[in-house]
Amino acid sequence: MRSPVRDLARNDGEESTDRTPLLPGAPRAEAAPVCCSARYNLAILAFFGFFIVYALRVNLSVALVDMVDSNTTLEDNRTSKACPEHSAPIKVHHNQTGKKYQWDAETQGWILGSFFYGYIITQIPGGYVASKIGGKMLLGFGILGTAVLTLFTPIAADLGVGPLIVLRALEGLGEGVTFPAMHAMWSSWAPPLERSKLLSISYAGAQLGTVISLPLSGIICYYMNWTYVFYFFGTIGIFWFLLWIWLVSDTPQKHKRISHYEKEYILSSLRNQLSSQKSVPWVPILKSLPLWAIVVAHFSYNWTFYTLLTLLPTYMKEILRFNVQENGFLSSLPYLGSWLCMILSGQAADNLRAKWNFSTLCVRRIFSLIGMIGPAVFLVAAGFIGCDYSLAVAFLTISTTLGGFCSSGFSINHLDIAPSYAGILLGITNTFATIPGMVGPVIAKSLTPDNTVGEWQTVFYIAAAINVFGAIFFTLFAKGEVQNWALNDHHGHRH
């Protein structure tokens, strides 16, 4: 007897158009074992790669505190008196051998923001190049270049603010190709019914990189000095690159150690989804409403993500008035929750498709709604509860944690609608989604001149409203099947 839940899940207009060859009604290849498989080895190596990507991105946020002369930052102290002190001030005695710089708050903002000015430039070129030559070398050298540049951060800082800003922008150029390149690789490696699992494992490394690198950078600064933060993470990046080049291949056909059974399983599952066209159908891509649904969702999600990533430590310190030790731990807690949520939601999403017969579109909608509406609700709640420290931390943690559901929602929808051009599509959406990282924190700072609870409520309400709009837009206009323009004959209809 058929489950009515399954029937409902399929009743979204996709019954005859969901081009996922492993769904019921199409030939089903027996899944190749997971243990020691080439595709899961790729996911694990990618996990550590994106761990390093985010460690290299956020380590400066911690090191900068130790790089700047405390007398300079005291002039910019904006700690609010709206909430009472609830922890005793601590005296931090640690290694002070690192050089100090006279950088005011505005200069520090330019240093931290310069990364995104490079990052936004290489999104679309990265996706295009990956679609032509493969993502392995592009991703590898993108991280290697960023790691090597990170090693030169102390020298650049000594030379002045200008060289340091240029260095960070160059690091952004290197990291800008990483996500599009990875998407391009998964278009050849991820069977449709394993996409959520494989991609959530890969990209969850970014969240864990944030969780670990924030407190670890603080520990390195405490016991050594800030220069070793950059030497440590830069060296780790170089070691990862050597493993990546040795163990990974662009496609299953090129992999030297993949089993014949696994290779045939992957290739057969993707047989009706990939295009052999050499030219990129730019006009149909840019006219595609499902692509713009992802753009809007990606932009909306990142507005909240980057606002919290850059300003959560500020909110913890200046409004909730946690001391520096508590702040480091509590600011990383939401990303630990998000990491766990990404891993678990990937498993759940693929189970809904494989075992419960939910359509691709239905799963992407459900997970995007949870991952965007949920954070919006708890962000608003965090603004309402004011100085209740425990609830504020709990709500902000839950908000960021629920955002992890999006890793199985709009975040991988590029592979559903155009697997052959997934890297290019991610480059397009991530270009727009980088804008919040550049302007969101600036707008938030301008909205909180007096650092009152009411001003921060406005910041949270705006982020929540943008999230809700993105969720609704994606739900209305997203698709879950390969689009006609992404197939060999994009002027005809594929049956």
Curated annotation (Swiss-Prot):
GO terms for cellular component: apical plasma membrane; basolateral plasma membrane; cytosol; glutamatergic synapse; lysosomal membrane; lysosome; membrane; plasma membrane. Residues 1-41, 131-136, 180-200, 249-279, 350-365, 413-423, 479-495 are cytoplasmic. It catalyses: N-acetylneuraminate(in) + H(+)(in) = N-acetylneuraminate(out) + H(+)(out); D-glucuronate(out) + H(+)(out) = D-glucuronate(in) + H(+)(in); 2 nitrate(out) + H(+)(out) = 2 nitrate(in) + H(+)(in); L-aspartate(out) = L-aspartate(in). One of its GO terms (molecular function) is carbohydrate:proton symporter activity. One of its GO terms (biological process) is monoatomic anion transport. It is a multi-pass membrane protein. Glycans are attached at N71, N77, N95. It comes from the Eukaryota. Residues 63-109, 158, 222-227, 301-328, 387-391, 445-457 are lumenal. Residues 1-18 have a biased composition (Basic and acidic residues). The chain crosses the membrane at residues 42-62, 110-130, 137-157, 159-179, 201-221, 228-248, 280-300, 329-349, 366-386, 392-412, 424-444, 458-478. Coiled coil: none annotated. Signal peptide: none annotated. Residues 1-24 are annotated as: Disordered. Its main location: membrane. Keywords: Amino-acid transport, Cell membrane, Cytoplasmic vesicle, Disease variant, Glycoprotein, Lysosome, Membrane, Phosphoprotein, Symport, Synapse, Transmembrane, Transmembrane helix, Transport. Gene3D superfamilies: MFS general substrate transporter like domains (1.20.1250.20). Pfam families: MFS_1 (PF07690). It is found in: Basolateral cell membrane; Cytoplasmic vesicle, Secretory vesicle, Synaptic vesicle membrane; Lysosome membrane. A motif (Dileucine internalization motif) lies at residues 22-23. Changing K136E: In SD; alters intracellular localization, only partially targeted to lysosomes and mainly detected in LAMP1-negative vesicles and in the Golgi apparatus; completely devoid of L-aspartate and L-glutamate transporter activity, but retains appreciable H(+)-coupled sialic acid transporter activity. The modification Phosphoserine is found at S3. Multifunctional anion transporter that operates via two distinct transport mechanisms, namely proton-coupled anion cotransport and membrane potential-dependent anion transport. Electroneutral proton-coupled acidic monosaccharide symporter, with a sugar to proton stoichiometry of 1:1. Exports glucuronic acid and free sialic acid derived from sialoglycoconjugate degradation out of lysosomes, driven by outwardly directed lysosomal pH gradient. It is linked to Salla disease: Sialic acid storage disease (SASD). SASDs are autosomal recessive neurodegenerative disorders characterized by hypotonia, cerebellar ataxia and intellectual disability. They are caused by a defect in the metabolism of sialic acid which results in increased urinary excretion of unconjugated sialic acid, specifically N-acetylneuraminic acid. Enlarged lysosomes are seen on electron microscopic studies. Clinical symptoms of SD present usually at age less than 1 year and progression is slow. Belongs to the major facilitator superfamily. Sodium/anion cotransporter family. This is Sialin. The gene is SLC17A5.
